[in-house]
Amino acid sequence: MTRTDFAQSAVASIFTGAIASHAAVLADDLGLFDALAKGKLRNRDLDRSPWLRNRIRISGALEALCRVGAVQRCTDGYELTDVGTELAGQVPVFRLWLGGYASVLAGQISIGADPATGVHGGIVAESSGAIGARYLDETIVNLLESLRPEGRICDIGCGTGARLLRVCRRVNQPGIGYDLSAKAVEAARETVDEARRIGVDIDVRQGDATALTQDHPDVDIVTQAFMTHHIAPDEYCAAVLRSYRSRFPRARYLVIFDTVPSQDSEEPEIFAPGFDYIHALQNMEPRSRGAARRMFTEAGYICREEVELAVPNSYAWVLEMRDREGPAS
């Protein structure tokens, strides 16, 4: 699947519709359909009471509905379309099955969320690993191999550890992974066992990227996989990244892989609508590509290389401490 296929695949409409279906229930709960039925909902109004306290969730719901043509952006806000008017009339059907039976739907998939994260960490780890294996890992492994690792690889946010194993096997170096989720670390046991069977030295531990306490002087390259956007605000994230210099005193590179928000997209798509909407429900505003680059600079890093990845709105950044020599990209 190419980048274009994420938007043009028939599955894109199914996925985007699933996200928008939940957004319709949320929009109704927040009173958005009633407000839009009266006319344009202006951005300046969303920044005032009664909307302000739910501003991020409101934006997430409106953007999800834009992708299915129920709401459209206008110069200074949002307005309901004919499809949106029809949807508003059918919202009780969505509320009945998606709202009234939400716990039944959730219960069919998993028996409980990870207390540390509030999400089903095992599902996140395994699904992310499968997405990575299909669309990302070969690019990432090639990128890390090009850096000619001279010691241990540390992967922060390693999930099941599958990518870490693949990297370490390719470059013939040991590895260590950290993940906040106990469920993810549990899922990684199988990967660690496989590594031992084939003679690759890797270990996976539970750990918080913002509170690492153990020094790893043998680590040459640190990777941080699709979780930097969870560390906020920017000043705090920059401080966390600076702390890695103490935790990994001999590391030559910090390589960050992450996803940034969509920019005014109105088309059905695989992956991106989920990223944008779920983070809005978590009251999070992931930083933009430009904001990420500025934050890396604030943290004391130079971006040596930026690679656009196959998953929409996703990038790899090869970072080096500013006091090291070499041209920046």
UniProtKB/Swiss-Prot annotation:
Keyword terms, alphabetized: Antibiotic biosynthesis, Methyltransferase, S-adenosyl-L-methionine, Transferase
GO molecular function, one term: indolepyruvate C-methyltransferase activity
Phenotype caused by lack of the gene: Cells laking this gene are unable to produce indolmycenate.
Catalysis performed (reactions): indole-3-pyruvate + S-adenosyl-L-methionine = (R)-3-(indol-3-yl)-2-oxobutanoate + S-adenosyl-L-homocysteine + H(+)
pH dependence comment: Optimum pH is 7.5-8.5. Loss of methyltransferase activity at pH 5.5 and below.
InterPro entries noted in UniProt: Methyltransf_25, SAM-dependent_MTases_sf, WH-like_DNA-bd_sf
Major enzyme class: transferase
CDD domains: AdoMet_MTases
GO biological process, alphabetically ordered: antibiotic biosynthetic process; methylation
Activity regulation information from UniProt: Strongly inhibited by the thiol reagents p-chloromercuribenzoate and N-ethylmaleimide. Partially inhibited by o-phenanthroline and 2,2'-dipyridyl. Competitively inhibited by L-tryptophan and indolmycin.
EC number: 2.1.1.47
Family indicated by similarity: Belongs to the methyltransferase superfamily.
Main function: Involved in the biosynthesis of the antibiotic indolmycin, an inhibitor of the bacterial tryptophan-tRNA synthetases. Catalyzes the transfer of a methyl group from S-adenosyl-L-methionine to position 3 of the aliphatic side chain of (indol-3-yl)pyruvate to yield 3-methylindolepyruvate.
Protein name: Indolepyruvate C-methyltransferase
Encoding gene per record: ind1
